[in-house]
């Protein structure tokens, strides 16, 4: 590329000389930019054959080659010389069975074999002939008693037997005649103080509270304030007294009447036996009742409102009480 720039500069200078007859050398120009790479040239021709190179190092041994084809059978070799006995070879495979040899001599008798299993029972044989009479056997045991013979004549009277055992006690005889009065005996020693017999007991007193006042009608009143129930004969859950000691009892009730009328009944085993009725007149009032009842074991006694909710004015608070009491007067046992 630089050659082209030089030729161009020379041409310009020559033209200027011809026109002006004189030419002065100018300052060198600024170097141009490098040109682009030209196209690659064609491959050169093959050079002449070079000299033979030095021998290379031996290569690594090659792998085993494939088996060649089986060659033709060779001619028999000459007889070899007998050498020393070789090593015993491995045992060959078993050959085919040989032909049967001649029958051998009879061997000695073998030992007695084990007893064989019992064979099945054979068929019943025919009856044999009667054998000769055997010798007389020993005397047999006594046979059973024969039937009773005829009654013989009465024998002579025997000797008296031994005395028999005493017979059972006879019946009691009639009372004898009363004997004369005996003499007065001496005064005995003072006895010890005896223990008092344990008397059966049963008693309770229960009352209403602010929560249980104005009880529902036609059902046992459940008194939930326990004043006395040591023996547990009053059942708080059911409102009933249950008899655990048969006898005669006294039951009583005291009622504070307020806000409504009252009508109550004392009930024994479902039957009403005592009734009390009181009307409310605008101020507190008191009503009561009491009765003596004979009871058997398991009998039930309770108090209930009758006549509906208009007659359940049984009242209780911290200053007023409604109570139900019962206790045993005496047992019947």
Curated annotation (Swiss-Prot):
Gly residues composition bias: residue spans: 59-68
Keyword field: Collagen, Repeat, Secreted, Signal
Residues of the Collagen-like domain: 24-82, 84-132, 134-193
Signal peptide: 1-19
Source species, domain of life: Eukaryota
Composition-biased stretches (Low complexity): 26-40, 130-157
Start and end residues of each C1q domain: 197-333
Compartment(s) of residence: Secreted
Coiled coil location: none
SMART domains, per the entry: C1Q
GO cellular component, one term: extracellular region
Chain spans, region Disordered: 19-196
A Pfam family reported for this protein in Swiss-Prot or TrEMBL: Collagen
Biased composition annotated in UniProt, kind: Basic and acidic residues: 42-57, 69-88, 183-193
Protein name stated in the entry: Complement C1q and tumor necrosis factor-related protein 9
Gene behind the chain: C1QTNF9
């Amino acid at each position: 590329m630089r050659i082209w720039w030089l030729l161009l500069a020379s041409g310009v200078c020559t033209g200027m000389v011809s026109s002006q007859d004189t030419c002065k050398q100018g300052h060198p120009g600024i170097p141009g930019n490098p040109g682009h790479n030209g196209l690659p040239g064609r491959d050169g021709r093959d050079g002449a054959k070079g000299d033979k190179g030095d021998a290379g190092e031996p290569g690594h041994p090659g792998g085993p080659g494939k088996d060649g084809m089986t060659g033709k059978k060779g001619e028999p070799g000459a007889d070899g010389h007998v050498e020393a006995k070789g090593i015993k070879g491995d045992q060959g495979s078993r050959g085919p069975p040989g032909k049967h040899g001649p029958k051998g001599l009879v061997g000695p008798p073998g030992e007695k074999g084990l007893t064989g299993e019992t064979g099945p029972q054979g068929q019943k044989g025919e009856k044999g002939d009667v054998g000769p009479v055997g010798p007389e056997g020993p005397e047999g045991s006594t046979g059973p008693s024969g039937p009773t013979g005829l009654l013989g004549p009465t024998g002579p009277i025997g000797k008296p037997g031994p005395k028999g055992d005493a017979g059972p006690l006879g019946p009691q005889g009639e009372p004898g005649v009363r004997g004369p009065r005996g003499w007065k005996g001496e005064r005995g020693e003072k006895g010890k103080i005896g223990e008092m017999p344990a008397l059966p007991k049963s008693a309770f007193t229960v009352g209403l509270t602010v929560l249980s006042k104005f009880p529902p009608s036609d059902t046992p009143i459940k008194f939930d304030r326990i004043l006395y129930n040591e023996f547990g004969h009053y059942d708080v859950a059911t409102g009933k007294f249950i008899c655990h000691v048969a006898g005669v009892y006294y039951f009583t009730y005291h009622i504070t009447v307020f806000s409504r009328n009252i009508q109550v009944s004392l009930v024994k085993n479902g039957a009403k036996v005592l009734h009390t009725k009181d009307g409310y007149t605008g101020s507190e009032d008191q009503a009561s009742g009491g009765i003596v009842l004979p009871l058997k074991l398991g009998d039930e006694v309770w108090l209930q409102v009758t006549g509906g909710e208009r007659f359940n004015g049984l009242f209780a608070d911290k200053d007023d009480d409604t109570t139900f009491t019962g206790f045993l007067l005496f047992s019947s046992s």
